[in-house]
């Protein structure tokens, strides 16, 4: 527990560079359907996993949405003078657990644009994700979000903490 707290304390010191997110984590907020926390972990400069924990309201039902998406990024789709604007797309699976109204499991195809700032380890994104529910019955699902994430190098922070212990 002590080690985990120290890692968190040093995260701000070890922010990722805006030009290379490989191996870095982004933590932020998303507003939309669902609204909540967004975590993105880049495996390399084009592949990432996106994790969602949010609050969902659809058709008068409220509940928690938990999901994971695998994303591919295309940095050549749109160019910018400063920063980068990747188009990303992928596939994912989400679970909605409604208060007193059952659960919904659905597959989705996230499509989005992100603006990665050139001077800060921050991105701002817009995402649209159509999907198909398989539980409790087949139906169409639509997710959308606008949000932002701060990126940091967790491995660099962990090494720094271990050196101090």
Pin down the residues of each PLM region.
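Sec-dependent N-terminal signal peptides
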Residues: 4-13
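Short glycine/proline- and aromatic-enriched beta-strand/turn motifs that initiate or cap beta-hairpins
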Residues: 18-58, 65
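Mid-chain, structured segments of secreted extracytoplasmic proteins
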Residues: 63-103
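Sequence/structural signature of outer-membrane beta-barrel proteins
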Residues: 36, 54-60, 75-77, 93-100, ...
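Residues on the lipid-exposed face of transmembrane beta-strands in outer-membrane beta-barrel proteins
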Residues: 29, 33, 37-41, 68-74, ...
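Short loop/turn motifs that connect adjacent beta-strands in outer-membrane beta-barrel proteins
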Residues: 19-23, 45-46, 75-86, 101, ...
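Outer-membrane beta-barrel "beta-signal"
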Residues: 67-70, 140-165
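Residues that define the transmembrane beta-barrel architecture of outer-membrane proteins
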Residues: 23-25, 31-35, 62-66, 85, ...
